[in-house]
């Protein structure tokens, strides 16, 4: 699979923030977007996921065949329905207002594009044991929400209200929600904001693990050293 920017011009209110971008990202790659504050990293991510409309150009998804070839007609992200797009691309934005939900309930919202109902404490066990409610089970019989909580190291927070957490803890919850969405393309805007050194390392290890599973991971970050060591491609804005 490929995720590509085709002569993409992005910006605010018709004012371009950069020259046309042409880039192609492959399954299993980590892509770092670097740039000073105000350079347009967040705007670019929002345009990639169609939260903002491009000034010109397209963001495309080319689905691969078993023989490694690509389909002739790619999907254009901005022409997809909201639900279809949410099955292909997820985005982690900087922590904002959080609803009065438990950690488990908020993370389970990532499953809505797949037709799964949000999980509360009363139905998590039921959903894990009933594939008819899930529509799918992951290997090891873990529900995608439970797996996301475990991967992000926050299973012990499942019953806590998100509003009681620190900014760094909320950031990890929102990352778990994006993981639970289980899209082949993940966009992350400064995913290590508010995190200490140990938690930052854990997040970057998780992103490497997800890329090894074949996902395309695109990260807007100020962590230049990490980008130079681990990213397969770097976009400098």
List each model region and its residues.
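The feature captures the beta-strand-to-loop junction immediately N-terminal to the Walker
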Residues: 34-36
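Helix-to-loop junction immediately C-terminal to a conserved catalytic motif
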Residues: 49
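ABC ATPase NBD Q-loop/coupling interface
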Residues: 58-84
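Conserved ABC ATPase "signature" region
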Residues: 140-157
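Conserved ABC ATPase signature
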Residues: 161-165
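Catalytic Walker B motif of ABC-type/P-loop ATPase nucleotide-binding domains
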Residues: 186-190
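H-loop/switch region of ABC-family ATPase nucleotide-binding domains
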Residues: 221-222
């Amino acid at each position: 699979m490929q995720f590509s920017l085709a002569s993409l011009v992005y910006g605010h209110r018709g004012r371009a923030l950069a020259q046309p971008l042409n880039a192609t990202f492959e399954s299993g790659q980590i892509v770092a977007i670097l740039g000073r504050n105000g350079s347009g990293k967040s705007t670019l991510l929002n345009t990639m996921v169609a939260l903002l409309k491009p000034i010109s150009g397209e963001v495309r998804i080319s689905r691969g065949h078993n023989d490694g070839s690509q389909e002739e007609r790619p999907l254009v992200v901005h022409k997809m329905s909201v639900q279809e797009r949410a099955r292909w691309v997820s985005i982690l934005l900087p922590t904002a207002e959080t609803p009065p939900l438990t950690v488990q309930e908020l993370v389970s919202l990532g499953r809505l594009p797949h037709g799964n109902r949000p999980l509360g404490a009363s139905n998590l066990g039921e959903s894990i044991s009933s594939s008819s409610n899930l529509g799918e089970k992951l290997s090891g019989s873990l529900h995608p929400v439970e797996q996301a909580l475990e991967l992000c190291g926050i299973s012990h927070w499942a019953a806590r209200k998100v509003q009681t957490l620190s900014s760094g803890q909320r950031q990890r919850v929102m990352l778990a929600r994006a993981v639970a969405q289980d899209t082949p393309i993940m966009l992350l805007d400064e995913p290590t904001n508010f995190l200490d050194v140990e938690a930052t390392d854990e997040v970057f290890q998780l992103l490497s693990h997800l890329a090894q599973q074949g996902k395309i991971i695109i990260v807007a970050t100020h962590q230049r050293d990490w980008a130079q060591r681990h990213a397969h491609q770097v976009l400098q804005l």
